[in-house]
């Protein structure tokens, strides 16, 4: 548990891994959702250097493997104050860690255009999953 709000600053959680799995992560085990969002939280005892959205270990080893999540992983808003002010760097870090999509809620058209020019094309897995979900909704 953290007393911080990632809209304002970076929350840091010091719980032991075993406690995190039992109390926090277990809720997501074998979740059948098509989408899941990462959190801008630093789990000190899991990855002491990277917040969850930027952590290859948390995304690939925990969310994808241990929790068996097979859907699209979306970053939380990359313009939140818990992160640096460089949106392109934030987007790259999230995608490189394993997020399929990045969320930008800042509403600045110039920043949105800049991000779109710099981001890579959505991968085949994400396209396929998004299309499947779209067909499900129809």
Residue spans for each PLM region:
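Second-shell residues forming the walls of enzyme active-site clefts
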Residues: 1-118, 122-126, 133-136
């Amino acid at each position: 548990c953290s007393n911080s709000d990632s809209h304002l600053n970076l929350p840091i959680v010091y719980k032991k891994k075993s406690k995190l799995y039992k109390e926090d992560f277990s809720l997501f085990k074998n979740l059948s959702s098509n989408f899941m969002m990462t959190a801008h939280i630093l789990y000190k005892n899991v990855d002491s250097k990277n917040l969850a959205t930027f952590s290859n270990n948390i995304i690939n080893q925990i969310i994808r493997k241990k929790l068996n999540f097979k859907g699209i992983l979306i970053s939380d808003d990359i313009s939140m104050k818990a992160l640096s002010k460089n949106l392109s760097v934030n987007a790259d870090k999230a995608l490189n860690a394993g997020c399929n999509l990045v969320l930008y809620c800042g509403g600045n058209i110039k920043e949105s255009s800049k991000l779109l020019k710099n981001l890579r094309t959505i991968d085949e897995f994400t396209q396929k999953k998004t299309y499947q979900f779209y067909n499900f909704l129809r």
